Design a protein with these regions (language model features):
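A residue-level marker of the well-folded mature domains of exported/periplasmic proteins
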Residues: 1-172
């Protein structure tokens, strides 16, 4: 994986941890961009002996929702997936004034085998923007890879950090 982004960093971390701790590891890439295709790869990993599955990206929320109770012996680490993201999957429309559960007998929950990890991308973005201006760059722009919440938070932080440094230095 060489996308120089979240996927690559996650994969490199999994490899490093597994190698340092004598663990086996494998990479499974969904064939497409649907929950069904992500779940199929999760199930393939489990059938091949995976005990811990690391999933990078908010798009895995529904996959966690679908797999967490079905595979209680497997640990799921969902990066950039909040508990609210997973719990929202229990509803037909989580944003409705009175959300209706898909299954009235299944209340929203995060199973003990799930760890949701979210980052404060805006803080890293702030530091990047601040450092750019402090290093003398005063004509800046920000282009994120995709218009997704994590990238938007980073971009917002970048702008705020650049503005703060420019204010300190009296630079426009």
């Amino acid at each position: 994986i060489t996308d120089q982004s979240f996927n690559q960093t996650t994969w490199e971390a999994v490899q490093a941890y597994a190698q340092e701790n004598g663990k086996t590891y494998a990479y499974y890439k969904p064939a497409g961009d649907s929950t069904a295709e992500r779940v199929a790869k999760i199930e393939q990993a489990i059938s091949q002996g995976a005990k811990v599955i690391v999933m990078p990206g908010f798009a895995f929320a529904e996959s966690v929702y679908e797999c967490q109770d079905e595979y209680p012996e497997v640990k799921f680490i969902a990066l950039d997936v909040s508990q609210a993201d997973v719990e929202g999957c229990f509803y037909v429309d989580p944003y409705a004034p009175e959300p209706e559960l898909i299954d009235p007998n299944n209340e929203p929950h995060i199973s003990p085998n799930v760890v949701c990890v979210v980052f404060q991308e805006e803080e890293a973005g702030y530091l990047a923007g601040y450092a750019a201006v402090k290093d003398g760059y005063t004509r800046l722009g920000f282009c994120g890879g995709m218009a997704v919440p994590a990238v938007q938070r980073f971009g917002s932080g970048f702008i705020q950090g650049a503005d703060a440094a420019a204010s300190e230095m009296n630079v426009e």
